[in-house]
Amino acid sequence: MLALLTAGCADPEAARRLDANIESMNERIKQAQEELNTYGKGTVVHDLIALRIAIHQQTLAMLEQRRAAQQWRTTLIYTVDGTPYAAPADLAARVAALQGRLKNARDGRESDLQLMRGSADSVRPLYITSIATKTVQIAQLEYQLAAHTNGFPPYYVPVSAPAKSATPQAPAGKPATAR
């Protein structure tokens, strides 16, 4: 359930920051989509990049919704499990903790990038997978940080339902066979 209330004038500096965040998120999505094309569909790295794109798209939608609310001078009130969402009392501490975790995740990814550059070809796939995994973690932390700093509940909801199993179910009492 979403309630709309009329509010006063929007802060121009907040609007500029929000526009910069939206532009940055669009760039991240574009970069990730280009990166996605370099890996075959169904590979672990391809799927990790696709997950990162989905997280970025949700973050972008959240930021665009906040920007539209500012432009129309509307206050959005969110409910979680039937209860109006309110920012936690320790919001500043949570934001600081998220910023620390984000810095650590970025440092870890950078470390893996450096190690990969000096590694033998035989171990590069391991570093690529590790880097892709850490980049998903970074996207998740960025989403949480954007949610906290823009007044959204920091929950991630998948964009689409999970794919159904490609393996057919065997009738009761019969073994499953591959076709």
Q: Model-predicted segments: where are they?
A:
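C-terminal motif of bacterial Sec signal peptides marking the signal peptidase cleavage site
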Residues: L5-G8
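Bacterial signal peptide processing site
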Residues: A10-P12
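Post-signal peptide N-terminal segment of mature Sec-exported envelope proteins
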Residues: A14-G42, D47
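Short, charged, amphipathic alpha-helical segments
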Residues: D19-A20, V45-Q58, S122-E142
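Amphipathic alpha-helical coiled-coil segments
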Residues: A32-L36, A54-I77, K103-E110, K134-F152
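Charged, low-complexity interaction regions
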Residues: L36-I49, T75, S111-I128, T149-G151, ...
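Extended alpha-helical coiled-coil "stalk/arm" regions
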Residues: G40-R94
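Compositionally biased, proline/threonine/alanine/serine-rich low-complexity intrinsically disordered stretches
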Residues: A96, T149-R179
